[in-house]
A protein has these predicted regions:
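Short Gly/Pro-enriched turn/cap motifs at secondary-structure boundaries
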Residues: 53-54, 119-121, 181-184
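Glycine- and acidic-residue-rich catalytic/RNA-contacting loop of pseudouridine synthases
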Residues: 20-34, 38, 74, 92-139, ...
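Pseudouridine synthases involved in rRNA/tRNA modification
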Residues: 1-10, 17-23, 156-236
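Short, solvent-exposed secondary-structure boundary/capping segments
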Residues: 137-143, 215
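Residue-level signal for inorganic ion chemistry
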Residues: 15, 64, 90, 129, ...
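A short alpha->loop->secondary-structure connector
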Residues: 28-32, 79-86
Length: 236
């Protein structure tokens, strides 16, 4: 379900596998948070574990957990003030209406647990993105969210006509989503960058699950994106 990437006295960074629920679903103790907590507490380095952000079930990649209440409060403030830089990778098989830029708008509940992007801007979801051509008419997206809305990145790409491959909600009409080749939802939490108690931290984690994430074309592309914060991002 996960592997530990890094630990300090105040927090732990893990790599979440794809198709793993963050919370318990059905069986108590079966969710990701419960499993991480069980593992970290068994090491005897802390007495409690606190979630500070989350990933959807289909999404793999980097997650941070606080190891004490003070750290949890600090991280809560960092996320609230958007001082944790988050970068994601996604693959779509549909030509987008625009290849880079800004996706911005309020989000509202739709049908079947879905959300939709609105044209209003009262409390908008904000996402910057670049995209890169890949083989087999696929397109790689590097995404930088500036808000933390439910399904934000999935809705953002769907709104420009490029739903994420394997997304069970937003890619129902995608060219290849229903074919056996699709072995996961292709969204991955790739990088985190933040300052905590005066020290700077950077974490980069390329995906290691999914056939499309293992292709030579994909590997060549992300070699050029190993410091995503250095790119000339579209204006907010």
């Amino acid at each position: 379900m996960f592997k530990v990437i890094s630990q300090t006295n105040d927090f732990v960074v893990i790599a979440k596998n794809a198709d793993v629920n963050f919370h318990d679903e059905g069986t108590p103790g079966s969710g990701l948070f419960s499993k991480v907590k069980e593992y970290i507490l068994s090491e005897g380095n802390c007495q409690e574990l606190y979630p500070v952000h989350r990933l959807d079930k289909m999404t793999s990649g980097l997650l941070v957990f606080a190891k004490n209440s003070i750290s949890a409060k600090i991280f809560g403030e960092l996320f609230e003030k958007h001082q944790v830089e988050k970068y994601y990778l996604a693959i779509s098989d549909t030509k987008p209406t625009k290849k880079q830029g800004l996706i911005k708008g309020d989000m509202a509940k739709s049908r079947r647990g879905m959300f939709k992007l609105m044209r209003t801007m009262e409390n908008p979801a904000i996402t910057q993105f670049f995209s890169y051509s890949m083989e087999n008419k696929q397109r790689l997206y590097l995404l930088k969210p500036h808000s933390g809305k439910t399904h934000q990145l999935r809705v953002a790409l769907s709104s420009i006509g490029a739903p994420i491959i394997g997304d069970p909600l937003y890619a129902s009409n995608s060219n290849i989503t229903s074919k056996p080749l699709v072995d996961r939802g292709y969204l991955h939490a790739y990088a985190l960058r933040f300052e905590f108690l005066g020290e700077s931290y950077e974490f980069i984690l390329p995906p290691d699950e999914g056939a499309f994430f293992q292709s030579d074309c994909f590997t060549d592309r992300i070699e050029q994106l190993n410091k995503p914060w250095l790119l000339n991002w579209p204006k907010l």
